[in-house]
Amino acid sequence: MKILVLNSGSSSIKFQLFLMEENRSIASGIVEQIGSENSRAVLKANSKEYEKKRAIKDHHEGLDVMNELFRESNTLHDLSELDGIGHRIVHGGESFFSSMIVDDSVIAKIEQISPLAPLHNPGHIAGIKNAMQSSGDVPHVVVFDTVFHQTMPEYAYRYALPYDICKEHHIRKYGFHGTSHRYVCKRAASLMGMEFQNFNAISLHLGNGASACAVQNGKSIDTSMGLSPLEGLIMGTRSGDMDPAVVVYLLNIGVLKWDEIDTFLNKKSGLFGICGSSDMRDVVTRMANDERAKLAFEMFCYRVKKYIGAYYAVLGHVDALIFTGGIGENAPNTRQKICDDLKHLGIHVNHDLNFSKERGERCLDDKNAKIKTFVIPTNEELEIAIETMRVIKERAKI
């Protein structure tokens, strides 16, 4: 069974082809700078790289070039050969509680909630429509980053703002990175020999974007990101949690203008705002001689630690703490700082295991730990492929 996963942005298409009998990627690539003269498409397969450079005017043409690369690499001759195509969708709003087979009504709902994700959902829609035109009768499935968090209770997702306004305008915590949190929690449960529906965990997706998730009995019951990915942890360029009155104050004294707020909070804050770098590797390198870099590191780790404590209190019993994402997987200094002084919670990270050069899925805790600590490399594309296959098979039973 072959499943193609597409992540269509406003000017790019990321893609990965999976052989589902082995849960194995057999080809991956990207079509980038769509709509410019400098468009480029790259595919990696069979330990080789295939590339085409030429102007690509739109997503339809981008998919045509992707097809050319598939044929050239002999991994796929036509999209109609596929058993399914899975599409990553950033925001499902309150309309979607599970992954869905795509039809006209699904596309219409995604278009309707695009104001909640104006930078992402329009590109997703363009990818879906063009892929459907190019793939014959192949079923398409949409997999939402927000769906995993739809199991949060209302007292966790509702904001303490005027209730009627929030209901009318769909203002609430939605959460993101759901596909990643679900994947790594499923893997950790499997490594512990536990059924996912009995598994409790605190999942930390730490990268340029970062979020925490409390998982109880295999379901998300709270997460740090909110209406947008801006809430919660300190990130590369995003502020995370802050007093909203800061923005009002800066507007009142003339430091900010209304049209500068989004850029200020999303692109000029976080690690970058504190020390001038959004890259945790650079921050760690500079810490010894740069007080601001040290401050950024300590603020980042402190914020994560606070969320661990909060989610421990909410969950009561925790089976595992999971690190994933670029920082979570590759920054032992950050993991160590976060886990230091958490022994009273049962989290004991072994220093040598944490700083080992070993990669891939691994356990970091020592013999005194009551809570397992894992590093699990995320694989959102594989999780989307698995979800796509599940939805298609369920439809076939009807």
UniProtKB/Swiss-Prot annotation:
Enzyme class: transferase
GO terms of molecular function: acetate kinase activity; ATP binding; magnesium ion binding
Residues annotated to bind substrate: 88
Active-site residues, as the UniProt record annotates them: 145 (proton donor/acceptor)
Binding, Mg(2+): 7, 380
The UniProt record lists the keyword Cell membrane: no
Essential cofactor(s): Mg(2+); Mn(2+)
Cofactor binding note of this UniProt entry: Mg(2+). Can also accept Mn(2+).
Catalytic activity: acetate + ATP = acetyl phosphate + ADP
Pathway, per record: Metabolic intermediate biosynthesis; acetyl-CoA biosynthesis; acetyl-CoA from acetate: step 1/2
Coiled-coil residue windows: none
GO annotation, biological process: acetate metabolic process; acetyl-CoA biosynthetic process
Entry EC no(s): 2.7.2.1
Domain of life: Bacteria
UniProt KW keywords: ATP-binding, Cytoplasm, Kinase, Magnesium, Metal-binding, Nucleotide-binding, Transferase
Pfam family, one: Acetate_kinase
Annotated compartments: Cytoplasm
Keyword match Cytoplasm: yes
InterPro entries in the cross-refs: Ac/propionate_kinase (IPR004372), Aliphatic_acid_kin_short-chain (IPR000890), Aliphatic_acid_kinase_CS (IPR023865), ATPase_NBD (IPR043129)
NCBIfam families: ackA (TIGR00016)
Subunit structure comment from the entry: Homodimer.
Family: Belongs to the acetokinase family.
Protein name as annotated: Acetate kinase
Organism this protein belongs to: Campylobacter curvus (strain 525.92)
